[in-house]
Amino acid sequence: VLIRDAEVEGQRRDVRVEGHHIAAIGRLSLRPGEPVIEACGGALLPGLHDHHIHLAAVAARRSSVQCGPPEVTDAEGLARALQVPGSGWLRAIGFHESVTSGQLPDAATLDRMVPERPLRLQHRTGRMWLLNSRALDELLAVAPPPPGLEHEGNRYTGRLFDEDAWLQQALGSVPPDFAAVSAELARFGVTGVTDMSPRNDPVIARHFAQQRAEGRLLQSTVLAGALAMADAPQSGWRLGPLKLHLHEAALPDFDEALAFVRAGHAQGRALAVHCVTEVELVFTLALLDAAGSLPGDRVEHVSVASPELVAQMVNLGLHACVQPHFIAERGDRYLADVEPQHHGDLYRLRTLLKAGLALAGGSDAPYGSADPWRAMAAAVSRTTPMGAAIGPEEALTPEQAMALYLADPLDLSRQRRIAPGEPADLCLLDRPWASARSRLDSGDVAVTIASGRLVHQRVDQTPFERLARADSPA
């Protein structure tokens, strides 16, 4: 394939793709029978990589009811949203306790909203499910109660904490198909993903491999997850970090966590730690200080970080995977819930960059938008849904925001480029970068090529041509 007259790093160039790689860049002659994409001066970028996503949860979301802000903001709205025709299990997502005046509903409360069918309502964090009585009855009929099922005396409240594996087993769940999610990511110009689910194991790895082999998952894939992932055959995916998901209210035993980190390091795997509170970050830094850091060890989210903790991250040589769009999606809630003295510590960007930390961007979808262009725009604006600014001094330039999604997924300190020999993972915009940088809009993506294969082209144009005159010499 010849991509003709594209803007590559500010220069008008032709780019030839052969097989899975970029073969040549420059002013190139068309070969007989060679397909052509007319770029017309549009910016050609390396394909974007989402460095933190939960693909199975994103796929499951498509058959779920949204039950949290901004769509649902109060208990009456929650009750209305849950009035879905049908029978059998009702899966609802996105709940936040602000909807119910700061209280987590129990089974009896949910029974008043959904009395006739089993309901499971997921908290926005992804770490908690709220079950009505019918759901409790069905689940406990096939599986013994797990430790994470809250009870008051002899009564189960229906609040289930950190028990996704138990829930999936009790429900007899099978991994979802990724085709629709993958096509949507391709529309955004995403050619690679790192799935950060801490429960990833050899079983789910086989599903990823099958989806890749069948062409249903178009993006190159890195899988983080459990220690057992190191023993899984790497077919269609590459092994990523060991994932540790901390929760401030129930931190693990320090020595047990230390042994976990050392076991991962012994596999040659970096550690990726979920840190959304200051306490979780302090715990992580102490853990890696004791274990000794490995190149590539990384902090996910870095939601709250004082300058002192940032300095410790630098001293340990850590990387950071950030979600700038959380400010644009939830910023007003942060301003209400987080103590004012910590507002400046929320979702830092420029401070991390200036300190020398390698940064990458991840959507955390479905817990945030999967559109990386929204995250880029949020990194530049730092504004909440209501228009308030959070840490405007932490804003990035459009180029710095874009760079979050151009990092090498196995080495966040390296930026991928368009160069001969590099993988043919490409994102072509319909306009030059000078115009696109002021918009940062996924609607500007005209063509996406993943591993040399056209996986998206916008419906309002037909960029592929086969020029008849090239089939015979002049």
Question: Language-model features: where?
Answer:
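Extended hydrophobic/aromatic segments used for targeting, binding, or gating
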Residues: A209-G240, A311, S442, S451
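A cross-family glycoside hydrolase active-site/sugar-binding cleft signature
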Residues: I93, Q122, D195-M196, S220-A226, ...
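Short, well-ordered coil/turn segments that N-cap beta-strands
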Residues: G88, P115-R117, V190-T191, G215-T221, ...
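Non-cysteine beta-strand/loop elements that form the S-adenosyl-L-methionine
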Residues: H54, G236-H247, L318-A328
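A structural microfeature
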Residues: A23-A24, A446-V447, H456
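His/Asp/Glu-enriched, well-ordered alpha-helical/loop segment
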Residues: R262-A272, V279-D297, H301-V302, P307, ...
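Glycine- and charge-enriched low-complexity intrinsically disordered segments
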Residues: Q457-D471
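Divalent metal-binding segments
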Residues: L2-L217, A228, L244-R262, Q267-V276, ...
